[in-house]
């Protein structure tokens, strides 16, 4: 009996969470409330923000209606530019960096140390506890 009551309460809670009033109020123009609709500008959340999404990319959508799409572009003559020659910079030799991070493991007969690659500053990880079942 307790199990049946717990199942009923769990299902009631799940139905209450899924049937909240917030999704009902957040349905704007047929789509749900998105992150950009909450925090972004209104243009981003608007479903009509990109009216040219169904046209090819070659269509000029800067002006709507397309009045000046076929306007002739002015001719531009390029003047010769001076040649740029790159100067050779002195080569810089980078010395290898010794990593000082060390892992130390102590067993019954020996102490093992191993460098920890990738540590820039001094890091020590010491495992001095005996392995399980060795005492």
Swiss-Prot record:
Domain notes for this protein: The tetrapeptide (A-A-P-[AV]) repeats found throughout the protein are also present in many proteins constituting the protective envelope of other species.
The organism's place on the tree of life at top rank: Eukaryota
Listed InterPro entries: Cuticle_Acp1
Full protein name: Adult cuticle protein 1
Task of the protein: Component of the cuticle of the adult fruit fly. Could be involved in thickening of the hard adult cuticle.
Swiss-Prot/TrEMBL GO biological process terms: adult chitin-based cuticle development
Pfam families the UniProt entry points to: Cuticle_4 (PF15955)
Signal peptide per UniProt: 1-19
Ranges for the Sequence repeats: 72-75, 78-81, 128-131
Organism: Drosophila melanogaster
Molecular functions per Gene Ontology: structural constituent of adult chitin-based cuticle
Summary of the tissues where the protein is detected: Detected in the epidermis underlying the head and thorax (including legs and wings), but not in the abdominal epidermis of newly eclosed flies.
Keyword annotations from UniProtKB, A to Z: Cuticle, Repeat, Signal
């Amino acid at each position: 009996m307790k199990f049946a009551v717990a199942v009923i309460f769990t299902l009631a809670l799940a139905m209450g969470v899924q049937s909240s009033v917030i999704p009902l109020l957040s349905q704007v123009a047929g789509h749900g409330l998105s992150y950009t609709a909450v925090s972004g500008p209104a243009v981003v959340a608007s479903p009509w923000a990109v009216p040219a999404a169904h046209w090819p990319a070659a269509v000029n959508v800067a002006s709507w209606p397309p009045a000046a799409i076929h306007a002739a572009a002015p001719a531009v003559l390029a003047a010769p530019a001076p040649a740029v020659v790159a100067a050779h910079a002195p080569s810089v030799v980078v010395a290898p960096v010794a990593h000082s991070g060390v892992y130390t493991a102590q067993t019954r007969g020996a102490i093992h140390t191993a460098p920890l690659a990738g540590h820039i500053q001094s890091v020590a990880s010491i495992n001095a506890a005996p392995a399980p079942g060795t005492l």
